[in-house]
Amino acid sequence: MQLGTGLLLAAVLSLQLAAAEAIWCHQCTGFGGCSHGSRCLRDSTHCVTTATRVLSNTEDLPLVTKMCHIGCPDIPSLGLGPYVSIACCQTSLCNHD
């Protein structure tokens, strides 16, 4: 009985430690895409990718911004305008191209 209790306690502690670790996301900005993985702050829960069409850009490549965020933001809260798409995910380095 004590062995089962000990195993249960070990499993709970390992889950708590995993939850306390920070997520990793690509954090960068570039036309057409970018990648630069780095650790987020502990309270970040999502990796976010935004793509903004810049009308003056002659190559018609979107300006891609990748970041860590608390939750998945809605487009108006980012203040990026009408030509924006957004994608969110919740696993480390999931916001790759």
Swiss-Prot record:
Q: Name one GO cellular component term.
A: plasma membrane
The gene is SLURP2
Task: Please state what the protein is called.
Answer: Secreted Ly-6/uPAR domain-containing protein 2
Name where it's found. Secreted
Organism in which the protein naturally occurs: Homo sapiens (Human)
How does this polypeptide assemble, per the annotation? Interacts with CHRNA3, CHRNA4, CHRNA5, CHRNA7, CHRNB2 and CHRNB4. Interacts with CHRM1 and CHRM3 probably in an allosteric manner.
Expression tissues = Expressed at highest levels in cervix and esophagus, followed by adult and fetal skin. Expressed at lower levels in brain, lung, stomach, small intestine, colon, rectum, uterus, and thymus. Not detected in spleen nor bone marrow. Up-regulated 3-fold in psoriatic lesional skin. In the epidermis, predominantly produced by keratinocytes of the suprabasal epidermal compartment (at protein level). In attached gingiva, produced at highest levels by basal cells located in the lowermost epithelial layers (at protein level). Detected in serum (at protein level).
- Domain UPAR/Ly6 as annotated: residue spans: 25-95
Q: Which Pfam family is an annotated match for this chain, by its short name?
A: UPAR_LY6
Name the UniProt key words of this record, in alphabetical order: Disulfide bond, Secreted, Signal
